[in-house]
Amino acid sequence: MSIIKAEEVTFEYVRRDENGNIEGKNRAIDKVSMDVKEGDFISILGANGSGKSTFAKHLNSILLPTEGTVWIDGMDSKDDEKLFTIRQTAGMVFQNPDNQIIGQVVEEDVAFGPENMGIPTEQIRERVDEALKTLGMMEFAKKSPNRLSGGQKQRVSIAGVLAMHPKCIVLDEPTAMLDPAGRKEVIRALRALNEVEKITIILITHYMEETIYSDKIFVMNKGKIMMEGSPREIFTHVEELEEYKLEVPKITLLAHELKKKGVDIPECILSDKELADALKKLV
């Protein structure tokens, strides 16, 4: 069953002059279609200006299509009467956790969403504890978010969304402001949410190595979907990805160069271990 379905979605920003008159329009998304099944881990890859973040904001009705339709669990994103339910169904996590965390204490911040939903107090306590345990943040429940690392803050942001019991979490470049350790921390948490909790994950990123465990990758450029497929299918197209200003993981690039020089290894290598195993077979 589809949890997210986009049909020929186009979005245009209106440009106005200093008097407020319309000067023209910029097309940020151009006829994008996408079908995300419940329980999938999907990654949307693209360089800055590709339209990926603009598209992400359509997935819980922050933005509405100029043309086309976005369905969230069968609900039209343009249906004002369903807006509350849509945002419960598809939670959103943004790039900077400091802009999303509002509580003075971690557990208070995680409780904010369920409180606004009108959840009974005893259930809020259960949801907060459950979300913090799932994200490995229970020991920080009484701490100030200001004392946490970037990766820990982002996990608190994700816990706040998780406490609202969404079917899907959309994450718009959640690791962009983190160091490598923080990035790994967040991606590990997302994989666990998907594999253990069966929550649909839609990850928006320009870091290709974060997408290796996805069920499917969509590559965007200039507002359009240029490629889609499994990580192995996508990573095979090294030159094309570089044209879209995406940085192919070093191990995949190394394997690609070896292959070009005639080394008999598989077409697409995704990890150090895969490359080591392939080279061992040649000895």
Which residues fall in each region the model found?
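Conserved ABC ATPase "signature" region
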Residues: 122-140
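Conserved ABC transporter NBD signature motif
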Residues: 68-78, 86
